[in-house]
Amino acid sequence: MTIPTKKLDYWSQKGATQAPKNLREKIEKVLTANESKIKRKNQLDIYLQGSYRNNTNIFGSSDVDIVVQSNATFFSNISKLEAYERKIYNQTFDEATYTWRYFKNDVIKTLQYAFGSSNVEIGNKSIKIFTEDYEADVIPCFEHRNYLSFGNSEEDREYIPGIKFFTTDKGESIINYPKKHYVFGVDKNERTNNYYKPTIRIFKNIKKQLIKQKRITKKVVSSYFIESLLYNVPDRYFCIDNASNRVADILNWLTKNQDSFSTFICQNEQMNLFGSSQEQWNEEDADKFIFEINKFWNEW
């Protein structure tokens, strides 16, 4: 047996979008208001990331990821620059005085003032805000520039933009590329006759069922990892109208290619999907996820 096409078509549908957008706008209004503790608040870039930004959210999703990016300063990686380029870089920029930790504390104080301290919880990677309908995971960060070239003029400088922040417990740095993730997801969706994102929603709903049945835990796979896993599946496997046939073919491809996980990349195309960093998945959990999907599929 396989999961009926009618059920898969329902699972492929997108959940609510307006309320998360309203929540983002509310948080932006709070952080940019005159009462805000943030310095240079006119240089903030506040945007959705994750499922709601990428249009892969499903019914019943409640966590809204909101990036609060300060462009007043930035982190950078200049390891790919030539010696003469690094010299120009060092002569161009001064050491920042408004550090990320000061920025994060200013964001926390402002959110606590606006929403009440009891509704603001400081997590390891984000600041959680509890509202009546949704939970917002606010991520204070600076821009991260991965420089590819650096000359005397702006025209001679090229970098890949991302974000960087640190964990609360150990102060470990996390670098990610949410805007790249979004752009490449849109491109793949267009190349696959707009079946890529609905298929992601199907896999997210299957994950939801697996957790409900206690076959896996939430820690085994995140929504981000599901998107990046499916990003590695060749486009032709998504270009199938019938959802049952499409999911079956994709699942078969993933099962046959588990030995190639080391070559898989994240949807942002800036790092490998599997590894030991905070931003990467481990192959054991991915194997478990695929095994349980196959079992769930065959037992339906």
Swiss-Prot record:
Keyword list (alphabetical) reads: Antiviral defense, Magnesium, Metal-binding, Nucleotide-binding, Nucleotidyltransferase, RNA-binding, Transferase
Q: Which cofactor does it need?
A: Mg(2+)
- EC number of this enzyme: 2.7.7.-
Q: Which GO terms describe its biological process?
A: defense response to virus
Pfam families to which the protein is assigned, alphabetical = NTP_transf_2 (PF01909)
SUPFAM superfamilies the record matches? Nucleotidyltransferase
- Record carries keyword Metal-binding: yes
Please give the superkingdom of this protein's source. Bacteria
GO MF entries: metal ion binding; nucleotide binding; nucleotidyltransferase activity; RNA binding
Q: Which InterPro entries match?
A: NT_2-5OAS_ClassI-CCAase (IPR006116), NT_sf (IPR043519), Polymerase_NTP_transf_dom (IPR002934)
Q: What is known about regulation of its activity? A: Binds to and probably activated by a virus-derived, approximately 400 nucleotide RNA (called CBASS-activating bacteriophage RNA, cabRNA) that begins in the viral terminase subunit terS and extends into terL, as well as by a shorter RNA with part of the cabRNA sequence able to form a hairpin. RNA secondary and/or tertiary structure, as well as viral infection itself, are important for CdnE activation.
Write down the top EC class of this protein. transferase
Q: Where does Mg(2+) bind?
A: 63, 65, 137
Cofactor: binding comment: Binds 1 Mg(2+) ion per subunit.
Q: What does this protein do?
A: Cyclic nucleotide synthase (second messenger synthase) of a CBASS antivirus system. CBASS (cyclic oligonucleotide-based antiphage signaling system) provides immunity against bacteriophage. The CD-NTase protein synthesizes cyclic nucleotides in response to infection; these serve as specific second messenger signals. The signals activate a diverse range of effectors, leading to bacterial cell death and thus abortive phage infection. A type I-B CBASS system. Protects S.aureus against phage infection. When the CBASS operon (cdnE and the following gene) is introduced in S.aureus strain RN4220 there is strong protection against lytic DNA phages 80alpha-vir and phi-NM1-gamma-6 but little to no protection against phages phi-NM4-gamma-4 or phi-12-gamma-3.
Family of this protein:
Belongs to the CD-NTase family. E01 subfamily.
Its recorded name reads: Cyclic nucleotide synthase CdnE01
Q: Which gene encodes it?
A: cdnE
